[in-house]
Each structure stands twice: as structure tokens, then as C-alpha cells.
Amino acid sequence: MLSPKRTRFRKQHRGKMKGISYRGNHICFGKYALQALEPAWITSRQIEAGRRAMTRKARRGGKFWVRIFPDKPVTVRPAETRMGSGKGCPEYWVAVVKPGRILYEMGGVTKNIARRAFSIAASKMPIRTQFIILEIE
């Protein structure tokens, strides 16, 4: 699973996910990409599940880039615990994704293989996504 090696603080505020993604919303490395259409927290497990599904589908042909990284800790309180006594312990890591953000990129494969691989990866995601192709002017 992806997670930061070290952070300055163990716990974070939840924050707001309003607006669209102004960074990380263009294809940079590959020719095809999977773009988010809704805001969400995507866990490191979901990112890894999508990556594995894509690599299985494309076999040895293509190269992949994961464009999101889970850098926000999510704290969870133990079950059947009374209120108070502070915030819970960090349980897992999430990437904050806004609409327009590129999740994965792929290159070195045909359009059909890329579309199929991304559709499998998209089914692992908790949000609606779209398949986009790099347009060179």
C-alpha cells in the first residue's frame, strides 16, 4: 500500500472538497488517462487495486503512471468507545481527489487495451470516471 514515509504531524483535519482540480488535470506522461468526475477520498487500497487490475489487463506491453498519492491520514475510533478522550488513531491513508484530477496514465498500448484496462480500474474506484486521450495539436 502507498503511504508517506514520514509526516510532520500524525493527524489532520478532514477539510472540504469543494471546487475542481486545477493541478494534475492534464495528461503528462502517457497517451491515455483515467480522469475523476466527482470529488472523493480514495484510499491506498483502492489505488493499489486499480493499479493491479490495469497491469493484469495490459500484461507486459504498457507503462503505467499513478498520478495520485495518499497523503492524508484518516483516524478511526475503536468500536463501542464512549465519546471524548481525544481523536482516534490513524487507521489508513487517503488521496483527496477533486473533479478533473487524473488518476492513472498509460502508454505503449493500443487504444482498445487501454480502454478495457481503465474500465476495470474504474470499477474499483468509488467515483465516476472518464477515459481521455492525449490530443496533440
From Swiss-Prot:
Major localisation: plastid
Compartments reported by the entry: Plastid
UniProt keywords, alphabetically: Plastid, Ribonucleoprotein, Ribosomal protein
Source domain of life: Eukaryota
Cystines in this chain: none
Record's keyword annotation contains Oxidoreductase: no
Cross-referenced InterPro entries: Ribosomal_uL16, Ribosomal_uL16_bact-type, Ribosomal_uL16_CS, Ribosomal_uL16_dom, Ribosomal_uL16_sf
GO biological-process terms attached to the record: mitochondrial translation
GO CC annotation, single: mitochondrial large ribosomal subunit
Gene3D superfamilies (alphabetical): Ribosomal protein L10e/L16 (3.90.1170.10)
SUPFAM superfamilies: Ribosomal protein L16p/L10e
Protein's UniProt keywords contain Cell division: no
Molecular-function GO term, any one: structural constituent of ribosome
HAMAP family with a match to the protein in the record: Ribosomal_uL16
PANTHER family with a match to the protein in the record: 50S/60S RIBOSOMAL PROTEIN L16, LARGE RIBOSOMAL SUBUNIT PROTEIN UL16M
Subunit structure: Part of the 50S ribosomal subunit.
Family label: Belongs to the universal ribosomal protein uL16 family.
Listed name of the protein: Large ribosomal subunit protein uL16c
Species per Swiss-Prot/TrEMBL record: Cuscuta reflexa (Southern Asian dodder)
